[in-house]
Amino acid sequence: MKTPSPGAVVSVRGSVVDVRFDENLPPIHSVLRAGDEGQIVIEVLAQLDARHVRGIALTPTQGLARGTAVEDTGGPLKVPVGKEVLSRMFDVFGDVIDRGAALSDFQLRSVHQAPPPLARRSTKSEIFETGIKAIDVLMPLERGGKAGLFGGAGVGKTVLLTEMIHNMVGQHEGVSIFCGIGERCREGQELYHEMKQAGVLPNMVMVFGQMNEPPGARFRVGHAALTMAEYFRDDEHRDVLLLVDNIFRFIQAGMEVSGLMGQMPSRLGYQPTMGTELSRLEERIANTDTGAITSIQAVYVPADDFTDPAAVHTFSHLSASIVLSRKRASEGLFPAIDPLQSNSKMAAPGIVGARHYGLAQEIRRTFAQYEQLKDIISMLGLEQLSPEDRNVVARARRLERFLTQPFFTTEQFTGLDGKLVSLEDALDGCERILRDEYKDYPESALYMIGAINEAKGKAKSDLTPASESAAKAPRPGPGAKLRATPEHAGDAHES
């Protein structure tokens, strides 16, 4: 093995640094260190000729100048892996940033790993149960698959991610890894404290490439988190839930790096290698014969343009799309998942079974009919609908409320005990609502419950009988509209 030789900086242009080595030119992805204490980290991305390499700085380049000595570390960027990383927060270099004690006993592993070979991949299409009714029934996730979570600010995206972490730990005895790419420092701190209060921190790892860091660090933090996830899958034989926020920021960081490196931009200014870079990250997320990495990724769609190259390349890797609706969030229907916009490739009769598939299709059909009838209701009122259409509206509104669910991670805010609902209980509840078994129950009896059997107890304790409540106005408060009975559907959807 060649002994790394010292080099010297020959040019600095922003985050791009050219270094001269008289012998033993470092290979691609080698990590170089400069500065008095080696605090400036540079990753080699190109070999310009026999003497020069070009790299991108993963740290601020303040204090770097021509002639500064550079040390070749002799290897790629590495991060710690093992049980010791659980409950800790790291940056792209694997340094702890939670103000806790430094790691003592750990092993290092390169962030640049090859995807698992096809021979090791599991070809079974297995359902990944989340314990969340709306997801498990209408858009089931794939074990070892990738789901995109589309949502703006304030619609419950972080709460949904937090609940998935909670359920993964309790239900699967797995490990959860949160990867913040371009994450705001404030959001990262809030999430850390939320996880700590929810009691899920002992079985999770958090890795952040914050918004104020150079593009090189944001570009590599996803690979660092995946390396930790692969250890738990391959060495510990455990299931891993990987949450990425936001995958668009990974592409954006790659675009910045590409521009700094002088590459010719592609469509809309994106890097010409975007497809390859995204595939290198996404293809490592897979289920093997030893375990699975299931990924939930927040996806930002620029200007709501689904033909944007970043969105197109991301969609090609996703097995499920979960769309959060601001309108449903404003009505208090949490989780605010839009059942008509969301979809999953796992929702097929050969995978979930004929009963599950038929129920999901019937639920979507009911919601679609309800959407079409809303305009008529807002203009003419519910009384102008035929008896059959009124039944459709009643079923849809009861299904909407049954698919809401109190979360464990929001108990301290709502005062409601969290519910983990099995797929069988969720399907049974939807089926009984579609059969009109609960047509005499007030809608609010189905709101924020777990299994359908809880509706009877809630109706007795909180509400008057349906025959009396039909003649009464909805209860005042923020949820008045959403708790309205079918007779008040016109009021609830005037806007």
Where are these regions (language model features)?
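Conserved P-loop
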Residues: 159-203
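Conserved catalytic/coupling modules of large nucleotide/cofactor-utilizing molecular machines
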Residues: 231, 249-250, 256-495
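Conserved glycine(s) of the Walker
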Residues: 156
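Loop/turn-to-beta-strand initiation segments
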Residues: 173-176, 202-205, 237-241, 290-295
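Residue-level signature of catalytic and energy-coupling elements of molecular machines
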Residues: 9, 14, 67, 89, ...
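Acidic-enriched and Gly/Ser
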Residues: 1-5, 12-130
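Phosphate-binding/switch loop-helix module in NTP-utilizing enzymes
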Residues: 138, 218-254
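P-loop NTPase nucleotide-binding/switch module
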Residues: 68-70, 77, 97-145, 150, ...
